[in-house]
């Protein structure tokens, strides 16, 4: 066993500073043991102090907020070169030494934990006196509340107490006797303990290790050093739900006006319907087609004129303007033209019909230059007018008109037998016929009233009128 001496000693520093560190020969003056701040505000720490012998001293010093200083509550020692330190001797350690046998916490640098158990001994008489006083109080209460029947029970209690006084024991004294029977704990010497059993935890000086909670129950409120710089403490937003919804809805409605392509597509969709207005063009094509069909007939008629191709003689020149040779050609052409005009009356107006007539007449009489007869003279306007106004031609036309009218009247009589038109319908038909005659006075002589189509739907309309 070594001759080293070890004692537990509590170092303290008064309240005021933020950080206090203990250093000395035990850690080669490195400042590795900070003091703990208590609830009172002062700093304390209990640690084992080793002495090589009785004459040896324990030198130490305090580092308060980074400044090395000496405490006035401990002995001071001047070292060479004007350095001053605190120190402890064996006498100082023995005075503060606690009872042997106290348990230590090695993780806390050998700090004491609790006091040794109380040594067992004879029971004290103070417990008996207290029990007797309590019993007397109980008696007085029971006497006030009890009746005659309860007096017997009180007497029995008195008898029991007298017996307890004779024996000198109570229920509590029994527990004391059991404590007496327990063996005594063997006292232990602090000097016999191994010196290297206590561990000192290394501490980083850069860390602020002295921060402690002033409130025992918890950490308490946090006080921020710069509350003005934190946005959460200054900025407060009051948002109105209605205004926010209106603003968001307005932003969403902005893309709705950008529906330009949709409008253009509608225009393009409607554009194909424009050709419907060009229906008259189709009608003119049909008329042109009908005219083209007439040209072969006219060409077929021309050989009648060009059958004999003799040399030009004065007799032939005189025979050309005769109406007898031209009459059958004109009559056949006019009859065919009249029939085809009747088929196209429902489509073309009166003005168009007159124009088409003039064109067809010109085409018929412009065919004369095709004949390869040099000596023949072309017909003049006067001769053509005389041919048209000839009585033979007019008589034939009137006969044909009468025949056509008779056939149409027969057909109408047959249809009228099937359908009995009302007086209103007859009036309407007469009014329409008069309107047609007034609209086209030139064609009234050659054209006949249009034949009405009588279909199923037409019959229904007439019935509902």
Curated annotation (Swiss-Prot):
It holds the Pfam family AMPK1_CBM. SUPFAM superfamilies: E set domains (SSF81296). One of its GO terms (molecular function) is protein kinase binding. Residues 337-363, 385-398, 404-428 have a biased composition (Basic and acidic residues). Residues 156-165 have a biased composition (Acidic residues). The modification Phosphothreonine is found at residues 182, 295, 366. GO terms for cellular component: cytoplasm; nucleotide-activated protein kinase complex; nucleus. Residues 127-151, 451-465 have a biased composition (Basic residues). GO terms for biological process: signal transduction. Residues 166-177 have a biased composition (Low complexity). Residues 107-227, 247-276, 298-465 are annotated as: Disordered. The modification Phosphoserine is found at residues 153, 156, 271, 319, 343, 394, 440. Cleaved in the vicinity of position 160 to give an X-DNA-binding N-terminal subpeptide and a non-DNA-binding C-terminal subpeptide. Keywords: DNA-binding, Phosphoprotein. Residues 160-161 are annotated as: X-DNA-binding. It comes from the Eukaryota. InterPro entries: AMPK1_CBM, CRP1_MDG1_kinase, Ig-like_fold, Ig_E-set. Belongs to the CRP1/MDG1 family. Cruciform DNA-binding protein which exerts an enhancing effect on the cleavage of cruciform DNA (X-DNA) by endonuclease VII from bacteriophage T4. This is Cruciform DNA-recognizing protein 1. The lineage of its organism: Eukaryota, Fungi, Dikarya, Ascomycota, Saccharomycotina.
């Amino acid at each position: 066993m070594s001759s080293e001496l070890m004692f537990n000693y509590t170092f303290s520093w008064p309240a005021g500073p933020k950080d206090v560190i203990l250093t000395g020969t035990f850690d080669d003056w490195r400042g590795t043991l900070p003091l703990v701040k208590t609830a009172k505000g002062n700093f304390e720490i209990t640690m084992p102090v080793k002495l090589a012998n009785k004459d040896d001293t324990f030198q130490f010093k305090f580092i308060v907020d980074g400044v090395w200083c000496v405490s006035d509550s401990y002995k001071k020692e001047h070292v060479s070169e004007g350095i001053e330190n605190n120190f402890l001797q064996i006498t100082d350690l023995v005075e503060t030494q606690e009872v042997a046998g106290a348990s230590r916490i090695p993780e806390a640098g050998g700090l004491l934990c609790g006091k040794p158990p109380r040594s067992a001994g004879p029971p004290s008489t103070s417990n008996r006196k207290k029990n007797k006083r309590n019993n007397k109080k109980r008696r007085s209460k029971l006497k006030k509340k009890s009746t005659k029947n309860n007096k017997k029970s009180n007497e029995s209690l008195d008898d029991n107490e007298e017996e307890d006084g004779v024996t000198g024991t109570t229920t509590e004294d029994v527990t004391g006797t059991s404590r007496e029977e327990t063996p005594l704990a063997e006292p232990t010497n602090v000097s016999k303990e191994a010196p290297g059993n206590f561990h000192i935890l290394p501490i980083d000086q850069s860390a602020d290790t002295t921060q402690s909670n002033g409130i025992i129950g918890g950490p308490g409120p946090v006080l921020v050093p710069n509350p003005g710089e934190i946005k959460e403490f200054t900025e407060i937003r009051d948002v109105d739900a209605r205004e926010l919804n209106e603003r968001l809805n307005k932003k969403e409605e902005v893309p709705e006006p950008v529906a330009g392509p949709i409008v253009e597509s509608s225009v393009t969709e409607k554009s194909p319907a424009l050709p419907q207005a060009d229906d008259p063009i189709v009608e003119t094509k049909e008329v042109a087609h009908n005219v083209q069909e007439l040209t072969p007939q006219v060409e077929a008629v021309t050989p009648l004129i060009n059958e004999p191709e003799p040399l030009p003689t004065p007799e032939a020149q005189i025979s050309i303007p005769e109406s007898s040779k031209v009459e059958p050609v004109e009559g056949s052409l006019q009859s065919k033209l009249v029939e085809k005009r009747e088929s196209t009356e429902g489509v073309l107006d009166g003005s168009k019909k007159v124009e088409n007539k003039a064109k067809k007449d010109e085409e018929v009489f412009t065919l004369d230059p095709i004949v390869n007869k040099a000596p023949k003279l072309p017909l003049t306007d006067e001769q053509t007018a005389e041919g048209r106004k000839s009585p033979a031609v007019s008589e034939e036309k009137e006969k044909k008109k009468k025949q056509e009218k008779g056939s149409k009247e027969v057909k109408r009589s047959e249809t009228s037998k099937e359908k009995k038109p009302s007086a209103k319908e007859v009036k309407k038909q007469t009014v329409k016929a008069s309107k047609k005659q007034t609209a086209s006075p030139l064609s009234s002589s050659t054209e006949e009233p249009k034949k009405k189509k009588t279909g199923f739907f037409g019959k229904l309309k007439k019935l509902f009128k």
